[in-house]
Amino acid sequence: AVLARSRPDGIVVCNGYKDREFIRLALIGKQIGHRVYIVVEKLSELDLVIEESKALGVAPLLGVRVRLASIGAGKWQNTGGDKSKFGLSAAEVLRVIERLRAEKLLESLAMMHFHMGSQIANIQHIQSGMREGARYYAELRKLGAKIAVINVGGGLGVDYEGTRSRSFCSMNYSVAEYANNIVRALWEICHERNLPHPDIVSESGRALTAHHAVLITNVLDVERAPAVESPSAPAADEPQIIQDLWAGLQSLAARPPLEVYHDAAHWLHEAQTMFNHGVLTLKERARAEDIYFSTCRAVRARLQPGTRVHRETLDELNEKLADKVFCNYSLFQSMPDHWAIDQVFPILPLSRLNEEPTRRAVLQDITCDSDGRVDLYVDGEGVETSLPLHAPKQGEPYLLGIFMVGAYQEILGDMHNLFGDTDSVHV
């Protein structure tokens, strides 16, 4: 399929695992006029390439993948560096050069490939990897290999968070800065060693595909957070722990809100322990929880998002007081990376955009798996554990958009809970 759809002026790069049939097909592609590079990533592949090229009478177009010591930090750091699944060490690269020289095929080696990692967040890691890759290029040219193409592999990040930071779901550089660093590293080595300037190709799959898809889902049900806006004052004969919780709520106007919240959390824990030991009845425990959640709402109203010491508690209360919103999709099918590695995706309401959201929510899918829940949400300053949404209106549909799911999500998603495929619309 790749050969059939390849443009005459395009290139096809064959990397990854290769068996004899794969290599034969790649050589046939070269024979019929395509620029098909077979990238040698294991020494055993070189034997197969030489055997099949002789059998078909086709001079191969070869590349070699070098394994860099430089790696980019993050969830995918071991896709590059010494622990990479693919690539040749320095000693193995020398063995490839000598074998090709002995077979009079050194002229066929035209591409050098390396992979710095995936979703590299810090531009300094790209700079380090490119310096090492540029040195490899100079050394291969010195050994007589006519390398004309440098394949810098993947690594170009996607800023899922919008924070322009070194967080693993972000990137602290632009696409232009990435390109400038790639070109600069190779230009410098070419200028220093008086080498020809190679063509540069990349395999920036995530950066090319992440933005191409959005998942749209409708809200099916909402489980409201515990809400007793104005609990009544406790009677004189109610347990002391309830009296303490009530006194804390009443003191909020005169005390720091964080202090009141910490006391309320302590007293609630004490009340739950007393219930476990039979000291409190179920009705008394429920009463304690009502006063506690009322305290939480009152404290949240007094916290300032711009005050640093309030941020952690504010995020905690937003999650604690969030509604559970059940959406018509499967997390495991449509957002598997969120479940597996805490990948963050931007999520926004698509309905009632002319209204300010007044509730906080945690999204749940409709599988029977308790892990079917979105735990991390992009906001204006990073990542939070709840999402601002509108209060539901009876009988009115409410849609949510989950953005930037175009890279790997659909292909990785499974048939968990026997959910069928999501309907697709191509625009």
Language-model features, listed with the residues they occupy:
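Short, low-complexity, polar/charged sequence segments that are solvent-exposed and flexible
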Residues: 31-33, 56-60, 81-85, 130-133, ...
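Short, glycine-/Ser/Thr-/acidic-enriched flexible segments
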Residues: 17-19, 43-45, 67-69, 91-93, ...
